[in-house]
Amino acid sequence: MSASEDVWRKDLKMIHGYPMIYAFALNWERIEEFQSTPGDIVITTYPKSGTTWLSEIVDMVLNDGNVEKCKRDVITSKVPMLELSVPGIRISGVELLKKTPSPRIIKTHLPIDLLPKSFWENKCKMIYLARNGKDVAVSYYHFDLMNSINPLPGTWEEYLEKFLAGNVAYGSWFDHVKSWWEKREEHPLLYLYYEELKQNPKKEIKKIASFLDKTLDEEALDRIVHHTSFEMMKENPLVNYTHLPTAMMDHSKSPFMRKGIVGDWKNYFTMTQTEQFDAVYKKKMSGTTLEFCTDIQSA
């Protein structure tokens, strides 16, 4: 049996109180000991919140909207995922980052408590993209159907129960979005919403450029908006994850880029499930100024 065969569909493994993908949890010291540099740019999200979208936008901003430069490699190489480790299948994120020249763009889904201390010490710029929890739950469910390094999700009903309890990889969505929101008061952190990026991409991309000290003309902004639209990215083999082996991600079960819309949750949530989610939301999010849009029309 190859080293890669024993990580598929394994139960999550607890790391300092957080459920983590089994393959990623092996040799966790590599994460704790990771050394950042002050020029590192960290893209941080809860899973299925537009991470790849934001990664391509940031890469384009740093390259002044030059589409050809952004075609230099696949997204998983341009923007390595810090915690990624699938023995025998992929070079680990940490190993890839050692070879990546500065300024590095680093992707992670880690909760604040698990992020290597060196990112805080170096005051690395971070961009957090938050997406409403109902759409995240639906997207995460479909992702777990096709992503073999995650446990099988079971039925939608079973999965939603796990999601609401935080018994999914990276833990509670509620805790994740809330703790990163609070962190922006003490760290150079730009906090963005998926729904706002969807509704007014140029405005949000301007915020990203400003945060990264980049000045872009209107033509460059328009190129970025066009190149990073869902329709373009879904068909772009450099960013749609079709470059990964089918053993790891089976797009016949569900494409990595499925719909990319706001409000798809309405096609899955029953009235009872909506009430259940809203009750948990009210309890977990009390006292925070965070506000989420669950329907683009209401934005």
Swiss-Prot record:
Keywords of the record, alphabetical order, are: Cytoplasm, Transferase
UniProt-recorded Gene Ontology molecular function terms: aryl sulfotransferase activity; sulfotransferase activity
Q: In which tissues is it expressed?
A: Liver specific.
Pfam families assigned to the protein according to its UniProt record, in alphabetical order:
Sulfotransfer_1 (PF00685)
Top-level lineage group: Eukaryota
Q: What is its EC number?
A: 2.8.2.1
Q: What are the binding positions for 3'-phosphoadenylyl sulfate in this chain?
A: 48-53, 131, 139, 194, 228-233, 258-260
Catalytic function, reaction form: a phenol + 3'-phosphoadenylyl sulfate = an aryl sulfate + adenosine 3',5'-bisphosphate + H(+); 3,3',5-triiodo-L-thyronine + 3'-phosphoadenylyl sulfate = 3,3',5-triiodo-L-thyronine sulfate + adenosine 3',5'-bisphosphate + H(+); 3,3',5'-triiodo-L-thyronine + 3'-phosphoadenylyl sulfate = 3,3',5'-triiodo-L-thyronine sulfate + adenosine 3',5'-bisphosphate + H(+); 3,3'-diiodo-L-thyronine + 3'-phosphoadenylyl sulfate = 3,3'-diiodo-L-thyronine sulfate + adenosine 3',5'-bisphosphate + H(+)
An annotated GO BP: 3'-phosphoadenosine 5'-phosphosulfate metabolic process
- Sum up the protein's function in the record's words: Sulfotransferase that utilizes 3'-phospho-5'-adenylyl sulfate (PAPS) as sulfonate donor to catalyze the sulfate conjugation of dopamine, small phenols such as 1-naphthol and p-nitrophenol and thyroid hormones, including 3,3'-diiodothyronine, triidothyronine (T3) and reverse triiodothyronine (rT3). May play a role in gut microbiota-host metabolic interaction. O-sulfonates 4-ethylphenol (4-EP), a dietary tyrosine-derived metabolite produced by gut bacteria.
What is the protein named?
Sulfotransferase 1B1
- Taxonomic source organism: Mus musculus
